C-alpha cells in the first residue's frame, strides 16, 4: 500500500506502476490493496514467470521492494540480474544484499520512498538490452568447430 500511495502522490502521467505477484489467499488486506491499486490505475499482473516476467523486467524503469518482512529476496536478486535500478526497504534481508546506500529507504517511510521514486524517474532511462547475436546456434556451432580445429 505504501508503494501505491507513494507512486500516486507523484502524479506521473507518463509512467505506470506494475505490481507482479499475488497472495496465496485472499484476506481483508489483499482486498484493500487491490481496491487501492484499481483506484490509482495500478496494473496488477498476478503471478508471472518465464517470458512474461522477462518482458516485464526488460521494459521496467526500476524495481521496488518495499517489504516490511522478507526472507531471501529472490525477486530483488532477479531484478538485479537484469541490471535494473532498485529501491528497497532497509529490512535486514535486503541489507544483506549489500546495495549502495541510496538504494534503501526507511521501512514504512512513504515520503522517503516517494523521493527515491521521483529521483529515479527524472534520470535518463537506459533500457536493458541483451545482445543475443552471440548466442545463436550457428555461431555457437562455429565456435565449437573452431575449438576442435585448434586442437589438432
What is each of the regions a protein language model found here?
Residues 30-51:
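Nucleotide-activated donor-binding/catalytic signature segment of Leloir-type glycosyltransferases, i.e.
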Residues 68:
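Aromatic "clamp/platform" in nucleotide-sugar-dependent glycosyltransferases that forms part
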Residues 81, 85-88:
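Short hydrophobic beta-strand element within catalytic cores of glycosyltransferases
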Residues 102-110, 118-122:
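Conserved acidic donor-binding segment of nucleotide-sugar-dependent glycosyltransferases
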Residues 1-9, 31:
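A conserved mid-protein helix/loop that constitutes part of the nucleotide-sugar donor-binding site
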Residues 47-48, 55-60, 144:
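Short alpha-helical donor nucleotide-sugar binding micro-motif in glycosyltransferases
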Residues 122-152:
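A charged, aromatic-enriched C-terminal amphipathic alpha-helix characteristic of glycosyltransferases
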